[in-house]
Curated annotation (Swiss-Prot):
The 4 large subunits of the cytochrome b6-f complex are cytochrome b6, subunit IV (17 kDa polypeptide, petD), cytochrome f and the Rieske protein, while the 4 small subunits are petG, petL, petM and petN. The complex functions as a dimer. GO terms for molecular function: electron transporter, transferring electrons within cytochrome b6/f complex of photosystem II activity; electron transporter, transferring electrons within the cyclic electron transport pathway of photosynthesis activity; ubiquinol-cytochrome-c reductase activity. The keyword Ribonucleoprotein does not apply. PANTHER family: CYTOCHROME B (PTHR19271), CYTOCHROME B_B6 C-TERMINAL REGION PROFILE DOMAIN-CONTAINING PROTEIN (PTHR19271:SF41). Keywords: Chloroplast, Electron transport, Membrane, Photosynthesis, Plastid, Thylakoid, Transmembrane, Transmembrane helix, Transport. This is Cytochrome b6-f complex subunit 4.
Amino acid sequence: MGVTKKPDLSDPVLRAKLAKGMGHNYYGEPAWPNDLLYIFPVCIFGTIACTVGLSVLEPVIVGEPANPFATPLEILPEWYFFPVFQILRTVPNKLLGVLLMAGVPVGLLTVPFIENVNKFQNPFRRPVATTVFLLGTVVAIWLGIGAALPIDTSLTLGLF
C-alpha cells in the first residue's frame, strides 16, 4: 500500500538527496532513555502543576448556574461542534447537510492518500496535503466563528 511505502534506497537520486541531508533523518537521539525518562515526566508534571496551580489560585464558576425552568434563547452545541453545526444551520436541505457532515471525516481519511508517492515524511515536501490541511483548518475556524454569530451574518462574519 502507498501509505506504508519505504524509501527506495537503490534510487541514485534519492541517495544523492540523502547524502546532502535533504531526506528524512531516521537517526539521531534515541527516545529511550532520553525522552521517556527525562523530558516526558517534566512535561507531564509541569502540565499538572500548572493546572492545579491555576485552579487553586483562580477558582471561578464555570458558566452560568443552571435554571431548569428557563429555556435559553438560542441553544448552542459545545465549541468543538460549531463547524458542523454551522453547516447544518446554513444548508437549506437537511439531507445535504448530513452528507456534508459525513464528508468531514471522509475528507480527513483521504488526506494521507493524496501524496502517497512522496518518499519523504517532511510535511514541507508534501505541498498538496499541507495545503488541504491548512485550507480545511481555515474553513473549520471560519465556520466555528460563524456558528456563534446570528444566522444573517454567520457566513460572512459581518465583514462583507
